């Protein structure tokens, strides 16, 4: 089954009456419809001939090219939408993919977004995030209960342009003139009074309506270019309105592809895309975004409204060539709804990239209402057009200077000029908050160059470099990976010259750090990547600890120029921790959407069907990771099979919610590690029931397409294979409920149960309800039964098994059970069973185990997404186990220098040597000719910087001096009065003189007694 794209229009509103919108999205493959992509642009007739020739030779007759009525029809295109009878579909696909001019064939997708609006008369402080999407108003009232008490009210600015000082650039004559901006949204009315330069409106939905029936497109356009009431940033920009969603909130992938092609034909400069979804593997969409930016279009996209959960970035904002925007409030706090990084494309073998790129205001922002006037909205789909409007303004100013702007140079300037928010990590804020004026100054002095994102790597810097700064490096540890984006402002295409070079600083013990570098050989469009694996050298002295430093040197050839750029790097090293304090996290056996339908772990959460947060310790298991670190444990991530780690280094292997199969070699390896090396294995599973999987499959009435899960919450049959050597197995029933263990309350959410366990082991049972029967329409009584859910077994090592992982997962967590993992770690560390596990012990009749054993779903499609199995003519077979990753050290040149403290700060871009900025007035004068700055503006600025500012400074200094003199006078006066009283003198000149002498002598005796030097 092909990857399904889930695209949502990220829309969160808090209007003048503070409307709260709940947004959901669904995406389905359209049955019997395929997008045929060609290797170039061809006219309609030519494309028809190519498809006809390919299908004619295969004997496929029942097919047709679907007509697309839109503004792009008159131009050549690089794709067609093809309908093929289901009977011939496999034949047709084979024939088409074999044609020399056909690049690929992918399913057509339908995207639907649902908005359910509730009006609330008071400001709603709880902003939309993934856990509450689609919930009813009762849940919102429950979430809002903490705001029933008094709290400080804050003023919300009425003009976002004033906050970001766009008016300063307006006074320079910079208003967006000459810049074409494409807005992909819900349309715009032609008669709306806020807009004066709507160059073109196009409808891509096929229903012939150009107006905005929802209001979102109007608001977005207003932030970019409104010229009255609630002002936009670039009122003179030329707006190109692309209506890509119907009023029923439906769209198709092909609509976007056509609209993107048209935007390229129209040579737009900037494109705002306030949509997104988790499917970064929808290749036609991703490819077309690359093509857009390769043609010089600066794309700004919302990062998503799925925060505060980590690993929730949306595509295309997570692409390297796109400016991904997160949201903040007006008090400069990260908005709760704003999606967090890291990217998850690179997992499990690699590590995610830094995203979002930048943040801006996205909470309670004023903008244009569909009916005229202004309203407020919140969401990253608001922050995105704020940045898009700012970029439009910047582009018009730079083009007026006769300079060139491209997607990379604009991104470099935004990142280098941003203001970092204190106490916020890089996966929340990116490079920081948008600074419009600083960005303009950077662009004004910009010269084409190559830069990094992040611009330096300091694994000792907390909080910004979280999670790297939370755990030092040590010998025998699994390499830590830092994934850096390379931005190429020289040209759309570049390539790496020679190889990157690691340059350790000898004065900072950089030679104790082993560095492995993998990188993209080519940079296209405008960007590439460099993955840095860091480990500790075996040459390091025993028990040595300290910081190490150096830099990585990379040379790029682009636009007939070789450009060398350095990435400063610093890390902390400690001696290896005790084995029992080291935990190995199994990432290799976690699978998620995309590409397949991997269902949710908690079946009670019906509005969130996909498991798409990567199940990583730095995404949806962030809370667990922080708890383990604060408890003194060191957590390492295994992105390879079990055959690739040394069990003698670790106290426990942690297997949480695995969906992948296990190699037979892995099962043998774990058995050996437990028996010979005392390794302990801790497993937290989830549900698996074939009937429930069939019950929760999707069926779309429009597309007539079934979407079947490829596994359950966990792959229980695979876990049973892993545990079979010990006589341990898990069952197919699904249970839920709430129970107590000791003085702790525990939520059990769609978990499995233990069906067999060694007699010498300990099994804990709790009273729960059968959720599987309820879902399947059986038991509606809510009857509770005793269910064995926790097993503890000791051989040479320990095996601990629990049936539900939701209490460790930040996604939909109700009450965490971190304490349970603490108790398990205490058990495997000391051998002493915590008292809390001695309650409700039961014995399991292993004779009945086979009755409850889970069976694999017949004809499931796990093999399409698995790294372990594949489908052959004889059935499902195991793939050869991959080789372990070897550490190939980077080319190294030791430098006899020390690190500069400025290296480990945001790196500045190189500037034009002719650009000499002495102060603001000189800077304005240098722009006067090209920016048409009026003499009045210069006079005002000159007066302020040349006369008013120094006078004001002098007045402040004199005021401070006067206050100090008065304070000293009153102090002496008080002491003089004390002296008169002590001497019994009157207020005469002689009396005052004697009183001062008395005070001086008295103070001198006291100070001498204290040893002061008088």
Model feature map: region roles:
Residues 558-1014:
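Short, surface-exposed patches at the edges or C-terminal ends of soluble domains, predominantly
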Residues 158, 268-272, 324, 358, ...:
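C-terminal subdomain of the subtilisin-like protease fold in secreted/lumenal serine endopeptidases
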Residues 15-18, 49-52, 56-171, 320:
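Autoinhibitory propeptides
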Residues 448-468, 489-535:
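Surface-exposed binding patches on compact interaction domains or structured appendages
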